Design a protein with these regions (language model features):
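Short acidic/glycine-rich loops and adjacent helix/strand connectors
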Residues: 1-157
Length: 157
């Protein structure tokens, strides 16, 4: 199964294709660090506009020679994140899913970080405790199993 993943929660436009048999088969990332550097932090409106300008190019770059019809599902970051930035990724995902007649999978940004180690093929034994630090969100999580976890504490950034 090939999943196209779209990430636009903050200041990076990223698209990847993951094949459940072969692993990562395509990816492209555009960072907005230079755009926001002079402001000392991410400006949400600038981030949204830049996602809008870059997302089609990033999609084509990630796709490479892969036929879009071979994509089985489209996942996108549904939150948390900057609202405008999230909407760019979500709308792109919806348009692509409609054009290709593929199902959509909304993904919680933080849950994506939580399960990312499983994609590398590493074996993790349940249960485990993890510290998840991502931008303005930090969590301590008791992971009992896939889709079975409890947030023990979190920051108030």
């Amino acid at each position: 199964m090939i999943t196209l993943g779209i990430e636009t929660s903050c200041d990076e436009t990223a698209i990847a294709l993951y094949d459940s048999k072969n692993g990562l088969i395509g990816e492209a990332v555009f960072s907005q660090i230079e755009l926001h550097r002079d402001y000392g932090g991410v400006i949400p409106e600038l981030a949204s506009r830049d996602h809008c300008q870059k997302i089609t190019h990033i999609f084509k770059e990630a796709l490479g020679d892969i036929n879009p019809n071979s994509i089985d599902q489209i996942a996108y970051t549904a939150g948390p994140g900057l609202l405008g930035a999230l909407l760019i990724g979500e709308n792109f995902a919806h348009g692509l899913a409609l054009a290709l007649s593929k199902p959509l999978v909304p993904v919680n940004h933080l849950e994506g970080h939580l399960i990312a180690p499983f994609l590398s093929g590493d074996k993790l034994d349940f249960p485990f405790l993890t510290l998840l630090v991502s931008g303005g969100h930090s969590l301590i999580i008791d992971v009992k199993d896939l889709n079975d976890y409890e947030i023990l504490g979190q920051s108030r950034d």
